[in-house]
């Protein structure tokens, strides 16, 4: 029987994919040491057990627009996260997106997946990969992923889109098309919730140039889910992130000093407020601090779409929100500079 160290050694000749480590680890009650979190991060020790957090659930079909705006604004100020139901994206579009993503990870040969892998050492985020950024002490998340942009057309590079399954492109383009209307409504509500005109926040964010970056997270079964994390605690760099998970529990939010599981609602859209909306709002809306746990027996997957500025776009507090009594809390800077500072853990 292989030891955890043996598993690591087996994979030293290539980039170690978590999916491969998981299949080698199946018969063991341990995992390689680089996946074992420090005690103050381990889910078993830090999760408030027996309580599932009911984050605000908002009906996007509510005929009372003022009520809906208030609910979205309040959730964004107090929680930084909410779930949308009756959002207008058909269940079939979500099912198709999830079906082709699952097929890519579970049925496409590994050699074919590696054809669209990120180049090691490249600054390009798109492609199939494993670790997104260097963590302190060399720790790793129990997750493989695929990144590619789905909108606008000028930003899309099909080199990073899987050719198999054959319906992958159609399913992702349809989901991206359906999502744009939802994005417009969220931005309008966030804008009105700050006392601005409905169009002002999305215009400050870049309007039609906002980039939709899709990520598929694949968290295989983990022999020690009590010790590992799928994704370490963080806030998103995006304006907002819109996510659909599969049915396996995993998303946790930090609130009132505790980590809580977030209740799964089938086909709801989970919306995270990201760093850039916190900046645009001058701190009125809060970027949500969250992480992902893993499961011993089941594969968890999620499909976040990060709504981001183009790299050269400057983001800062919206001037209309500023006054002597409310000076800017954030610097205005190009998004690429913000990303560089955050990934390298430099002050903003």
Swiss-Prot record:
Q: Which residues form the Fe2OG dioxygenase domain?
A: 209-309
Q: What is its EC number?
A: 1.14.11.9, 1.14.20.6
Q: Name one GO biological process term.
A: coumarin biosynthetic process
Instruction: Kindly list any coiled-coil regions of this protein.
Output: none
GO molecular function, a single term: flavanone 3-dioxygenase activity
Q: Which reaction does it catalyse?
A: a (2R,3R)-dihydroflavonol + 2-oxoglutarate + O2 = a flavonol + succinate + CO2 + H2O; a (2S)-flavan-4-one + 2-oxoglutarate + O2 = a (2R,3R)-dihydroflavonol + succinate + CO2
Can you cite an annotated GO cellular component? cytoplasm
Keyword Hydrolase attributed:
no
Kindly list the positions annotated as binding Fe cation.
Answer: 234, 236, 290
Its annotated compartments are:
Cytoplasm
Question: Which Gene3D superfamilies would you find in this protein's record?
Answer: B-lactam Antibiotic, Isopenicillin N Synthase, Chain
Instruction: Tell me the cofactors it needs.
Output: L-ascorbate; Fe cation
Pathway assigned in UniProt: Secondary metabolite biosynthesis; flavonoid biosynthesis
Q: How is the cofactor bound?
A: Binds 1 ascorbate molecule per subunit.
Alphabetically ordered keywords of this record: Cytoplasm, Dioxygenase, Flavonoid biosynthesis, Iron, Metal-binding, Oxidoreductase, Vitamin C
What PANTHER family does the database record attribute to this sequence? OXOGLUTARATE/IRON-DEPENDENT DIOXYGENASE
What's the family?
Belongs to the iron/ascorbate-dependent oxidoreductase family.
What is known about what this protein does?
Catalyzes the formation of flavonols from dihydroflavonols. It can act on dihydrokaempferol to produce kaempferol, on dihydroquercetin to produce quercitin and on dihydromyricetin to produce myricetin.
Q: What is this protein called?
A: Flavonol synthase/flavanone 3-hydroxylase
Q: Which organism is it from?
A: Petunia hybrida
